[in-house]
Design a protein with these regions (language model features):
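Active-site-proximal loop and beta-strand segments within enzyme catalytic domains
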Residues: 44-170
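Basic, Lys/Arg- and aromatic-enriched nucleic-acid-binding interface segment
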Residues: 173
């Protein structure tokens, strides 16, 4: 069996159950695509076939691209993993840590104990979180009139931290801010 036939067989098997409606696979080298094929349906509830030009919403794929771009900038000496991020993005100089809310629902904020670095941003240890999954940050966004991160508005990147940089890990808008650093440089 040829390599292409083996790949086709494996992918056809992958969609044969009810777990995956359909998929598109592409392999490329420096000269362009060397394999591409589509299998299954675009939607479990729909009979429309998957094609190699089907448009997907692939959440968080920009994180890998942003991480690679940031590390290329580090290799080139244009960014440093441990440089204070506010040296590149001045708006980060005003970033505070959200401690909670007072009895009138005003945010209680303080300055972070450590600097936000590119390393923190790339490892989700800067203190930024998603308002979707963090109740305190969701409340802050409502009280402060801050747009949700999912809107793609740059103002969403001005949210406060949920904890001090380097204190712990939490998934959030960190990579979006790292992406702004790459853009700025």
């Amino acid at each position: 069996m040829s390599s292409t036939a083996q790949i086709d067989s494996a992918l056809a098997t992958a969609i044969s159950g009810e777990q995956i409606a359909g998929l598109v696979a592409v392999a490329a080298d420096a000269n362009g695509p060397i394999y591409q094929s589509a299998f299954g349906r675009r939607n479990i509830a729909d009979s429309q076939r998957m094609t190699t030009d089907t448009v997907f919403r692939i959440a968080s794929m920009t994180k890998a691209i942003t991480g690679a771009a940031a590390m290329q900038m580090v290799e080139q000496g244009k960014l440093s993993l441990d440089q204070p991020a506010k040296e590149i993005l001045s708006f980060l100089a005003d970033t505070k840590v959200l401690l909670g809310f007072d009895s009138q629902d005003h945010p209680i904020l303080r300055a972070p104990r450590t600097e936000i670095t590119l390393r923190n941003l790339l490892t989700h240890t800067a203190g930024f979180v998603y308002d979707t999954w963090n109740q305190a940050m969701h409340k802050y966004a409502q009280v402060a009139g801050l747009p949700a991160a999912r809107t793609g508005k740059l103002e969403a990147l001005t949210a406060p931290l949920n904890f001090d940089p380097g204190e712990r890990w939490e998934y959030g808008i960190n990579i979006d801010i790292a992406g702004r650093m790459v853009e700025q440089v």
